Amino acid sequence: YVNNTYIVLGTKKGIIKKTSLEAYSRPRANGVIAITVRDGDELLDAVLTNGECEILLAGRKGRCCRFDESDARALGRTASGVRGINIDEDDEVIGMIAYDPKAEDAEAHSLLVVSEHGYGKRSEFDEYRKTNRGGKGVKTLNITEKTGSLVAMKNVTDENDLMIINRSGITIRMAVSNIKVAGRATQGVRLINIREGD
């Protein structure tokens, strides 16, 4: 935890909450409240940050919001958070990333997105312009009937491997370096063949 001073929590309805790690320094046997989740929402992810990261949130409909972590002030443990991305009522957030553009290896990182019908691609972080926290964001994958909705978003490097497991249990593994880097608003390439109903 030496380089991380905050924890950022994200929910499926696009709410984020940044809290100092110090707020969790006195755990109790029955746990501590980390966030008050509103009705109809649920916690999606938690990431550790150094206070100087950028947060990226993406929804199933293919839009991604990138903003400075400093746009969200630190809140107490029981607070419910602030709007991170503005999504439609029938949409939900599928991924949250904390990216440090000042890190030594920042150039080596790219954003990987995968759709429900097995399409995916990598894009440079610079392809995603910064927007205000709570905005609609920009298109991250060209969502079509062929691609299906967005299901995953990850911060990757060429040294990483990607594993995809479908509902019927078929697993494929590939080197991230084999997935070409493409523009932000393209549909990507087929990573796995998905059968009807899978």
Region locations from a protein language model:
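Short, structured "edge-of-domain" segments at secondary-structure transitions
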Residues: 1-198
